């Protein structure tokens, strides 16, 4: 990790990544289509707070401007000859920082991987910013004038053929939507929803390429395939959105059945803050007597199909979800318990993240946003014992306003099989994909962890939150934790090394990233770094045993929750498709915004190891 600090402020340029991790990584990754050959190259730049303060001290802004106007002026002054649009997902976070996102355009057509994010401080001045705008030669003619490109149906056929998608186009017809050059395909089968196509540019190899962005949700992969607008069997790049009452449950903080016994918990939303004003079983219009509410719909899905509305859920008119589990039972025998556990874990994590700032405006997963901004109608669909796979899990994160989807599988690595729903770390890891994909680049853009290093950090954030939440009061920085050990029945877990601050047990440093070409290995390095961050802050501020943090002047008063808050706030600051150095700078900037930099030394020490 020493290289991460030494990389310094010059890290506005992307880092190169190549090679393979030392050990075969397993679990918690989408099955099916390998998108690694099609990932976008890293192009983002990030101006951290200190550099931004020096750079924009003479920037002209008016005290009468709101934060969106100030952000817009910065983009115009930085790229005066470029065209762009404001993405409609700006908001002010709980730390007082305003977040505004912009998409570059050419001839009125989006450049899909060209983004600019501006973060405005409480004083109305630019706090930090990042961008991946295209600075090369623009197309001289508007492609819509001559329409010298293939129709979207050919692009759909090209994506299916090239990527071997399990979609049958049959008599596909492209039906125009309200948005210009956007189409929905009718007459197909094999996808969970109707495929879509939109005409967009992408930047690649220093040039702009006109493409059809073909969207196909095939379950284990929810893909945006950028098909060349003329040579429709050429797929330039691919983005995958999947990354994947009374309750008798394993209580919050118990990672799996080896750590304790199920207990009775009554009305848990009363102890989890303001994130669920309708309780966990209502959405402001409907009250449910099953494992469904404003935040989560949890059900079984033995067929593995895309239908979920009418799938089985435990039901109790008295809201008494009390079911039995023992380790000799097969998963099917305790599905009521498993669905209830999944419902409990995801709702609790939703409410915890809400307290940290993953709110309606920030793009969280809720049916009813209760007039607080954001798109709504996008609670998380959580499938227990999903029959589409085994020994894994995934979470699909489309943009704000579309449902997130979690698929939890059974694990055949033990006899009897084990249910991943009972390992909280796996559930938290998957839901954290929804968090990071909604926050990085803004809630309207789910493409901002699509590059290799950024995607690796997406995996690392999941492991970080899973590990931070399972810490016990008597743990010390000499305590190590694994991922997936119980479900996989694998001593040492499914990662290369356990998370530990001692380099004799976990020798990973930032320099190891250079030899990796797989997101889970990269994620293990990132989570290892964040585990040091976590313990440095706990050593400074202690660790609360409460589920929800206590806030003092807007910041959690204990180290564990402060670490989780700073990591979350950092996601909102960093550019689309960040690298390690930019993410590090964003976390340090998040501390500057939240505590006036009180924890900079502890953070820098962790990043310099």
Curated annotation (Swiss-Prot):
Binds 1 zinc ion per subunit. InterPro entries: FTP_domain (IPR011096), Fungal_virulence_M36 (IPR050371), Peptidase_M36 (IPR001842), Peptidase_M4/M1_CTD_sf (IPR027268). GO terms for cellular component: extracellular region. Zn(2+) binds at residues 429, 433. Its main location: secreted. Residues 1-19 form the signal peptide. The keyword Metal-binding applies. It is found in: Secreted. Its cofactor is Zn(2+). Secreted metalloproteinase probably acting as a virulence factor. This is Extracellular metalloproteinase 2. It comes from Trichophyton equinum.
